Amino acid sequence: MPTYILATRLSPEAMAKKFEPYEEEGLSWLDLVKQKCPDVKFLEHYTILGPWDFLDIFEAPNEEVAAKVSMITSSCGASRAESWTAIPYRRFMEIMRELG
C-alpha cells in the first residue's frame, strides 16, 4: 500500500483545554479513523516541535482514503492537516535507475 504522511496542527481552542482530555481525544480520533477507514494502517505517530504538532506515517489504499484521514483529523480539532505522499528511498532509487 502507498505510504502517506499526515502533519497536524492543533487549533488554539484545542490547545486552550486542560491536558487531561488529550489522550482520550486522541483515542477517539483514532477510533473514528479506524471506523471510517478500516484499511488504513498507522506505522508511526510523533509529537513534534516546530510549525506542526503531530506527524503520522500511515499506509492507505489510495489518495482518496488518505484524504479522508485528513478530513477526519480536521473535524476533530485540528486547525490544519496536510497529507503528503511518501516514496520509500529504495523505491526512489529504483525510479532513478529506470530513468537511466
Q: What residue ranges belong to the model's regions?
A:
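Short S/T/G/P-rich N-terminal loop/turn motif that feeds into the first structured element of a domain
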Residues: 1-38, 86, 90-100
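An amphipathic, aromatic/His-enriched active-site/gating alpha helix that lines ligand/cofactor pockets
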Residues: 60-90
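Short, glycine- and small/hydrophobic-rich beta-strand elements in well-ordered beta-sheets
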Residues: 30-54
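Short, well-ordered beta-strand segments in beta-rich or mixed alpha/beta enzyme
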Residues: 5-9, 46-69
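Short, functionally important structural connectors and interaction interfaces within domains
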Residues: 2, 41-44, 79
